[in-house]
Regions:
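Extended, low-hydrophobicity, polar/charged segments
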Residues: 1-161
Length: 161
């Protein structure tokens, strides 16, 4: 397997595609959404997760609010498939398909272009923070820029409380 992509690779992708986004280096890995929000001084709702699923073996990136869980039944229904056909990608599969280590995965700039869904709770925000291409980095951008760059479809896929 090739070496994992890095935040430098992400920065090159940002520069090459004229994306308005900033990679924020951190002093240490923030293992939880709460840690990331505290270190960045933002609300936990602004932290986003980029999660890789396999739908009948095909990769699908799902971007969700960091404090919410993806409802696989709802996701499957949106895609028009049975829930059992939607699997969460393993860490090895995610690395192979995106190039990034789980916990550092940005919402774009992957090894392969990925079909992407974004939950409306994310698009309702102005500024969001996601994986920055390294365990000790976060990416800051607007939700509008996130949608523009990913070409994502907005779909309600978060578990409702």
């Amino acid at each position: 397997m090739p070496d994992p992509l890095t935040r430098e690779d992400l920065q090159q992708f940002i520069d090459a595609n004229a994306i308005t986004a900033t990679i924020l280096p951190l002093d240490a890995h923030t293992a939880t959404v709460e840690d990331a929000a505290r270190v960045l001084g933002v609300d936990t709702i602004q932290i986003i997760k980029s999660l890789l699923f396999l739908v009948d073996g095909e990769p699908l990136l799902v971007i969700n609010n960091g404090t919410a869980r993806v409802d696989r039944k709802q996701l499957a229904g949106h895609l028009g498939v049975g829930r059992k056909r939607v699997k969460f990608a393993s860490a090895d599969q995610a690395l192979a398909l995106t190039g990034y280590v789980v916990g550092s995965m940005p919402p774009f700039g992957h090894r392969l272009p990925l079909k992407t869904l974004v939950d409306p709770a994310v698009t309702a925000l102005d500024t969001v923070y996601g994986g920055g291409g390294a365990l000790d980095a976060m990416l800051r951008l607007t939700a509008a820029e996130l949608l523009r760059v990913t070409g994502a479809e907005v779909a309600a896929i978060a578990e409702q409380e």
